[in-house]
Amino acid sequence: MTLSKAGVLLIIVLALASTLPAQTQTLTVLHNFTNLPDGGRPAGRLLLDPDGNLFGTTTIGGKIGYGSVFKVDASGNLSIFYSFAGPPDGNDPVSGLIRDAAGNLYGTTAHGGTTTVCGTDQPSWAGCGIVYKLDPSGTETVLHRFGSNGPDGGFPNGPLALDSSGTLWGSTQVGGEAGCTIPIPPNGRMVDVGCGTVFKVDASGIESVVHSFTKVDGAAPIGGVVQDQALNLYGVTLTGGLQNCPHAFFGSCGTVFKLDTSGQFSTFYSFKGGDGGPDGDIPESSLILDPAGNLYGTTNAGGSVQCDPIHLPGISCGTIFQLTPAGEETVLYSFGGSEAAGFPTNGLVRDAAGNFYGLVSGLVLKLDSMGKESILYTFTGYDIIASGDLVQDAAGNLYGTTYYGANGKGTVFKLTTPPDFAVAAFALSPASVPAGGSATAPLDIITVSGFNDAVRFTCSVSPKPAQSPQCSVTATAGTPATVTVSTSGPSVRVPSRSGASFSYAMWLPLLGLVGIGGLGSKKRKVKAMLLGCALCLGFASLVACGGGSISSGNRGTPTGAYTITVTGTSSVATGSLVRSTSAILQVQ
């Protein structure tokens, strides 16, 4: 038995009726587990292969009783791909699977490998787990057996990552450096189980510990690791880090860690404890990445909403968070509002349109790209204990498992999702213009789940000073739409002239010229002087009367950065879906 998630924070399944209207989606149960011989109580994220087959694990049952790896083909037929046998094989495979290009599967079991009790006096904790490989025929190879709470770690419970050299990366919840003492049931005896590790297993099967946690930099890593395009590894620790969460083990709030390509470990983010505030704490799900390198995950507590002030005072309901590649965190959503859900323990899946889907409190939730939540499906009975993370196919269908349900041994299900779209990100060309210049960009939409509707585009500019940029969207059937942003250039204004004063100012030098012309030619110097005086007097009169002043008029679009937001609306008559995206235009 691993460190229970419920041991860190009492997990309450909220049985409240939701005040949000549930969307009509179709759920199909693909298989009801019976324990023997097919397995029971599935856990971990399902794996979807290129042929549409699903692979997953059950923590009990199978042909021998120690858990199984199962396969559900594209027609919905389930078969047992492998049954665990217990030590020296593994048992209790709680993590999901990964697949290499050759079709081999890799995973971990939380227990088994050896018959040695793993760090406690509980026989059920025999063996610290294994790393295994299954070839396409279902033949197993044990790549590594973890020691008895030793320096190499124990209780791996999250998915692995596989790099291009064939090296596997993962984490163990205990083992490694000493310093993490927990109470062990049934008598609560305190045992130092170690703070957990990050490990690797190379292509030849040699395991090495890359980092041992110290509680200060995190403890009890959970959810495995993910790898970005630059080959950096990321994961979460259930606790450790900042001492600001009295409801968690060690009073710590949890962390997100990073391991770069040189092997350098760093605490990427330390949760601050957000009960009644914006931040979350106690992350216990796997992370996911988007194409831009942003990380997303959930926290089991924290956020801005308290779920049960009477029974759990001061404990908020959890969050969905984002971390940029620079380590800047944003809470995208706080649980516990109108959707009557909280304390998420599962991770997320994100579609191409930027929508998130997850299992929490017996609900399948959607958080759209605009940050609005909706309920896609509400489980009933034992099915409310959903296990593992969802996975999505190219058509937008979601697949997942429930831990109990049906025969009390769990199910595999498929759920349709509603059609949706997103306005694709755009970049203006040029991105910087002088006042009076213009920029354009092609627009497109990203569709998911069979979206097939007309989209009407509008655009807006912020801020909006006098002479702010103007934007418009043009579209021709069958071609991408175009957004055009134009700015105003400076202009010069010459004020109007008063008729009488202007006439006086003009006649004065003319009369002077006539008078001067009557003087003799011998008085040329005097004539020149008088002519100059007349011209100066006339010009002075012209300016004084407003006839010759020149002032600045329209100064054009002020310099600065402007946010250009394009909004797409589908089903124009009802306004059912509104999606937007933005770009920056710099005016020099």
Regions found by a protein language model. Name each.
Residues 2-423, 435:
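Extracellular beta-propeller repeat domains
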Residues 418-588:
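Long beta-sheet-rich domains in secretory-pathway and surface-associated proteins
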